[in-house]
């Protein structure tokens, strides 16, 4: 069972992940977001759907590459506080290091991008 301090850190990291995903979506023109977060003792899932977004195939490919990086607990412990603190194109770099599984679905015709993120607790 998670201790209170551990839950606090878990919640803070979840908020950082959501913030980074939102920043990415706003950067590419999203006008409306739907966010669903579910946390239990085993995992946290984040489902974010962005509407009115326009990204190129290159950005989509790059996003997949960044998110597919293996989770790195040591880097996460050190760097998670850095997310959201600069204007560099790093939104998804830290997200990739902090998650265990993901999927991205993009409907170009409708301008809808969906992230499904899983993080084992």
State where each predicted segment sits:
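Short, well-structured hydrophobic secondary-structure segments
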Residues: 33-49
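Conserved ATP-binding N-box helix of the HATPase_c
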Residues: 8-38, 89-98
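Short C-terminal beta-strand
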Residues: 110-120
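Conserved beta-strand core positions
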Residues: 31-33, 44, 102, 113
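Glycine-rich ATP-binding loops of the HATPase_c
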Residues: 100-106
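Beta-strand residues in well-ordered beta-sheet regions across diverse protein folds
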Residues: 47-49, 105, 114-116
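N-terminal presequence-like segments and adjacent domain-start helices
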Residues: 1-9
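Glycine-rich/acidic phosphate-handling loop/turn and adjacent ATP-lid/helix
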Residues: 46-92, 120
